[in-house]
Regions:
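Loop/turn elements at helix/coil->beta-strand transitions in domains of secreted/extracellular proteins
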Residues: 73-75, 121-125, 150-155, 193, ...
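Short, amphipathic alpha-helical "lid/cap" segments that border enzyme active or binding sites
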Residues: 136, 140, 220, 224, ...
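Serine-dependent acyl-ester chemistry module
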Residues: 105, 160-269, 282-294, 327-335
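Membrane-embedded segments
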Residues: 61, 65-153
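Second-shell loop/turn segments in exported
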Residues: 83-101, 128-129, 213-220, 255-258, ...
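N-terminal secretory targeting modules
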Residues: 1-77, 88-90, 95-101, 149-151, ...
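Catalytic cores of nucleotide-enabled group-transfer and carboxylate-activating enzymes in metabolic
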Residues: 107, 131, 158, 267, ...
C-alpha cells in the first residue's frame, strides 16, 4: 500500500494545505504530533519558494546541531513564523538555486554573527525556532515543550500575519495541544496501519459537505494571551525576553488586512508595556511607513535581506540599552 504521510492527515484546512501541504510546498515539511507540521530534518540546500533551505538534525535552520546548552554558552532562541525563519532570505531562483549571497542572512543569523565577532572568547548561539505558517498558538506550545531542554538565556518572539489570517477554524480547535490529541497524532505518525484507517474514516465523512465561516486563526485576545504566556514561560526559566511587533509593508495593497495587523500590533504593544516586557516595533517595517519602505520588503509580509539587517540592528541596540545579555559586549551594527 502507498505510504500515507502524517502531514496530509494533520493539516486539514484549505488555507493551511496551501501553505505547507500542497505538492509544491510540502518538500520541506513533515507532520508533527504537537504542532501539526515542522521542517524536515537534515535538509541540504533544498529549493523551496525562492528560498534555499538547509536544516540540522533537529529540524532547525541552523548549520550546527542543537542539544543541551553547553556550559558557558549564551543561547538566544528566536521564536516565530516565516519572517524569523527567513523566507526568501537570501532569495534564490529555481534555475540557480545555489547562486546566492551568503552575507544576506535572516536576523537570527546576523545576531549570532555580530555577537560572536564582538565576543570572540565566548560561545554564543542564536537560532530560529521558527517555521513558515506558525502562529503564536504553535510557538507557545513549542516553547513550553522544549524550553527546559534548550535552556535559553533569551527568547525573542514575533508572530502576526498567520495569527490574523482567516481560516476555516481557529487554531485552538484545529491544533489541540492536550496530551490526548497529541498522543493520537503521535500514533498516526508512527503507524501506517493507523494512518490508513484514519484516512479511510475521513474519506467517508468527506461526502458530507460542511459550511465554514472563516475566522482568524488566533483572535486578538488569544494573540495577547499567547504572548503573555510566552513571556511567563521564558521568565520562569530564567530567560530574558524581547517581543517584536510583526512587520507589514503597506495599507494600500490590502487595506482590511493592514487594519488587522495594526490592531493586533497595538494590542500587543499595550500589553507588553503593562508587564514591562521589552518590545520592539520598527516603524520602517510597518504599514505606517508604507510610502517609503519598499526597499526593506520582498513582498507585502516578509522583510528582505535589508529588512532583516534593520531588525538585527534595532535588536542589538535594544539589547544594549536594556542590558539584556549579561556581560556580553553588544556591537553597533549598521543596516
Amino acid at each position: 500500500m502507498p505510504r500515507v504521510e502524517s502531514l496530509d492527515l494533520f493539516v486539514n484546512t484549505v488555507q493551511q494545505k496551501m501553505q505547507v501541504a500542497s505538492p509544491q510546498q510540502s518538500t520541506i515539511f513533515e507532520g508533527d504530533p504537537l504542532l501539526l507540521w515542522r521542517l524536515k530534518p537534515n535538509l541540504g540546500h533544498v529549493y523551496w519558494d525562492f528560498t534555499n533551505v538547509s536544516t540540522n538534525a533537529q529540524s532547525i535552520r541552523a548549520d550546527y546541531p542543537i542539544g543541551r546548552k553547553p556550559a558557558g554558552t549564551f543561547r538566544i532562541v528566536c521564536l516565530g513564523d516565516s519572517v524569523t525563519f527567513g523566507y526568501r532570505v537570501p532569495p534564490v531562483w529555481p534555475e540557480k538555486p545555489n547562486d546566492f549571497n551568503p552575507e544576506w542572512q535572516p536576523y537570527p543569523m546576523l545576531l549570532e554573527t555580530e555577537l560572536r565577532k564582538a565576543n570572540p572568547n565566548r560561545s554564543i548561539e542564536v537560532f530560529p525556532m521558527a517555521v513558515p505558517g506558525y502562529t503564536s498558538h504553535q510557538g507557545l506550545a513549542w516553547l513550553r515543550r522544549d524550553i527546559g531542554y534548550l535552556q535559553p538565556d533569551m527568547v525573542i518572539a514575533s508572530f502576526g500575519w498567520n495569527d490574523a489570517s482567516l481560516s476555516d477554524a481557529p487554531d485552538r480547535e484545529l491544533i489541540d495541544t492536550r496530551w490526548t490529541s497529541v498522543t493520537g497524532r503521535w500514533l498516526i505518525d508512527h503507524s501506517q496501519a493507523i494512518a490508513h484507517v484514519t484516512r479511510w474514516m475521513r474519506s467517508r465523512k468527506a461526502a458530507t459537505p460542511v459550511v465554514h465561516t472563516p475566522a482568524p486563526r488566533v483572535s486578538q485576545k488569544e494573540y495577547v494571551d499567547n504572548f503573555n504566556a510566552i513571556v511567563r514561560v521564558a521568565k520562569d526559566h530564567g530567560a530574558a525576553v524581547i517581543v517584536i511587533g510583526a512587520p507589514y509593508r503597506d495599507s494600500v495593497t490590502n487595506p482590511a488586512e493592514a487594519q488587522l495587523m495594526t490592531q493586533y500590533r497595538a494590542w500587543l504593544k499595550s500589553e507588553m508595556a503593562k508587564n514591562q516586557t521589552p518590545y520592539l516595533e520598527i516603524l520602517e517595517l510597518t504599514e505606517a511607513a508604507g510610502s517609503v519602505n519598499q526597499g526593506f520588503f520582498g513582498e507585502l509580509i516578509h522583510p528582505n535581506h535589508m529588512g532583516h539587517r534593520l531588525m538585527a540592528s534595532e535588536l542589538l541596540e535594544l539589547m544594549s540599552q536594556r542590558h539584556l545579555v549579561g556581560d556580553l559586549r553588544v556591537p553597533e551594527f549598521v543596516p
